[in-house]
Amino acid sequence: MLTSWRTISLLQKTTSRFIKRSKTYADVRYNSQALQNHGVPGNKRKWMKRFVFVGAAGIGVYAWDRVYNAHALTRSIRTVYTASIIAADYKLNFSEKKADKIDALHQRVAQRLFKTIYKNGGLYIKMGQIIAMQSNNLPEAYGKAFQGMFDNAPQVEWEELQDIFKEQYGRPVEEVFASIEKRAAASASIAQVHRAVLPSGEKVAVKIQKPDVAKQMSWDLLVYKYMMYVYDKWIFHIPLYFTVDYVSERLRSEVDFTTEANNSEHAREGVEETDYLRDKIYIPKVYKEISGKRVMVTEWADGIPLYDQTALSEAGMSKKEILTNLFRFLAFQMFHSKQVHCDPHPGNILVRKNQAGLCQTVILDHGLYVFESEKFRKEFALLFTAAYSLDKKSILQVMDAWGIGQPELFANRMLNIPMDEEQPHTGEKIISKKEAFQQQLAERKKFIGFLQDCTRLPKELLMLGRCLMLIQKNNQNFGYPVNSIAVMAKVADKYTTDKPSPTWYQRLLSPIFWVFQHLFYPGNFRLPELTNDKK
């Protein structure tokens, strides 16, 4: 009996559903017929439905990207769009026929690029900083557009950081620190720093990763890879794509603060063990027991940022001493420890007086490091010692081993050594628009021929090249008070055991070169002794 009632109930439900569907179908047919009777064509109805469907899907994707994906898709689309417009603009308008409009072309491209980078934020800010530090190698419009790239990036509100603190500590942040300022003291591309005090009373800097960085990283690197491929293979034919995997790997390691803590600790130990660095360089201590992947706690270090030249002058800081300390530290890392800080831009360097009243350089942000092989370290050290002694043969030998097809370009741009026959002129030479275009075209051809064999280029050089250009730019900003090659060659020589014997003509020219240096550049080319002298 129970089975019969179940069967009857099932039949009733099925019949009811069938009747409802039939009514719905009939209504749809009736409404469709009514639309046809009112003169709405079938094709138009189809396109209306498609439009509604696509619009709804677009709104849904945008909402998902905004709420759950940290605008990563929107930023990627914005980047691809801007890069495509820039590529098309240069492809169509960078020509001899339009030489009189080249300056305007560079200006609008630089403005487009700056707006996109600043709006996207995150890792894009680092790209903007690279462009800013390369202003002397780029058209003037880029230098003007990117001159404010080292200012503080927009900071994230305190409430948005709470999930990261809970993920790190498993408890409210107020239980970890005696006090912590809710407004960031500094904000950079991927993180911001808050002042805090430990229960012990020690003042610390709490570096916390911005919440969106983890979600945006994969998207940003995917777009970077795509754009490098397109620019390399289809548009500019400049060898760029081979760098993608290595650069992406380095950037991924930078957002892991445990890696940064290890780098910082290693650098600190190296400085403390080296006589000529111990009192001149300072690396803040890391509190590893309360640091993790997305939060890092270090001791608070006061100082004047390297970019604030007015404050440095008012404090009586020596420009030469500041930069000598910086060059010695980086040379020590390049030619001895083999772990090199590759982000020495002015915002990551503070200057203060040590206990003896001497200038002391504080090095911050040890996330972006490169790790050298022993073979590369020896070749790199040889390059600098050869550069100082004007051993052109050894310089060319190293560059040939690295597959570099334009040694003059490499020496001029990265080492700041003039190897070509072109002599510097005094004053500003007035040239025509057509001549300016020809110069830019020649520079582009040089760069294309720069990498003769990408398979032989040491990957370390990709990041070290950035490091060298950054510190050369710092030197330029201060008016070149230090001969960086002389300072770094002295350190390289200290850690080079297999030194080649000088040739007869090097011995012959050495006294002449010495007289030339001291007559025209008194004190600037002298190899400084690696001591803790208190000059």
UniProtKB/Swiss-Prot annotation:
Question: What does the similarity note say?
Answer: Belongs to the protein kinase superfamily. ADCK protein kinase family.
Q: Which PANTHER family match?
A: ABC1 FAMILY PROTEIN, ABC1 FAMILY PROTEIN C10F6.14C
Query: Which Pfam family would be a valid example here?
Result: ABC1
Name the UniProt record assigns to this protein: ABC1 family protein C10F6.14c
Q: Which residues form a coiled coil?
A: none
Q: Kindly give the CDD domains that the UniProt entry links to this protein.
A: ADCK1-like (cd13969)
Which InterPro entries does the entry link to? ABC1_dom, ADCK1_dom, Kinase-like_dom_sf, Mito_struct-func_regulator
